[in-house]
Every structure is written in C-alpha cells, then in structure tokens.
Amino acid sequence: MMTVDEYAKLSRDDRLKRLERGPDDVAAVVRGHGDDVLSRRPDGKNWAPKEVVCHMRDIEELLMTRLTLMIATTEPKLVGFDPERTPDRWAEERQYLRNDTGEALAAFRRRREESITFLRGLAPAQWDRNAIHPTRGRMTIDDFVTLETWHDENHLEQLRRALAGRA
C-alpha cells in the first residue's frame, strides 16, 4: 500500500478520481456477503467489515465539516480526534454493529458525492486554505485530500483482511 507521502505525489485530479470511486470500491469488496459475515470481527480488537463501512461514512462527515470550516475561517484550530480512541468510541456509541451495511454504504456514497462536488467547486487559491490539525499541524485542503485518499485505501485493505478472517 502507498504511503501518505506517495499519495501526495499524485496529481490532484488523480486523487479526486480515487476518492470518487471509493464508495464503488467499498461496495465491490462487501458485495455478496451476508450480515453475519459483515458483522464478524476477525479478532477481539479489530473491526468487523460493517464497522469499517460505518467508520468511513462518519469520517466523510467529519471531513466535510473540516473543509467548510477551512473555507469559512482563517486557519482554524481543529477539534482533536484521537486516532487511538475516537474510532472505537464511535463504533460503540454509534452502535456500528447494529447499523445496516447497505444503508451505511449509501450514506457514505452520498457524503462522498457532496465532498467531491465541494472540492471540484473550489477556486485554485482555496486549495491552499489551511487549518491546524491537532496531531499533524498545519494542513491545507490539498493535504486533507491526500490523507483521505490514503485513508480510503487503508480501510479497503482492512475490509479485505476482515472478510478473509485476518486482522
């Protein structure tokens, strides 16, 4: 799998195209699997495929919140997101295992379409708008697109492993 830095070397259009096909890629990986398989965790500490899809849906919402804030505000300080605790807390609080995978995927698709429409509508100078990320420091909108592109691929690999019963 490529690193975040390797994704940063791709053209912006290439990264946007990868983001556009993200929901289709997720759908292709989970297609044909029943709820029992999609709800099965590969081990005690890794997510079930259904939880991964719900996480991707929720991260897309967080991304749009951050992007719109970056356009509306000069160099906002973003609210902390502890990658070690927040995703697991969301999975529990939002009851990911009780969610319908198809509905979560449809919501992810809608949110991603909104994100792509927003991003494609930006003026060239707006791509350099930035925010202060709590752990990564100053990040531009372009940096967030790079990170989200990597994030999709990371979770696609996680989905494949989970469906194969591997952590």
Where are these regions (language model features)?
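A glycine-rich, hydrophobic loop/mini-helix early in the fold
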Residues: A28, G32-H33, R41-D43
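Small-residue-biased structural context
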Residues: L16-R18, P23-D25, G32, R94-T101, ...
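Short, contiguous alpha-helical
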Residues: M2-D5, S39-P87, E113-I116, R120, ...
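Acidic/histidine-rich alpha-helical segments that form the ligand environment
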Residues: K17-D24, P87-D128
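A general secondary-structure boundary signal
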Residues: S11, L19-A27, E60-M64, D152
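Extreme N-terminal tail/first-helix region
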Residues: M1-R21
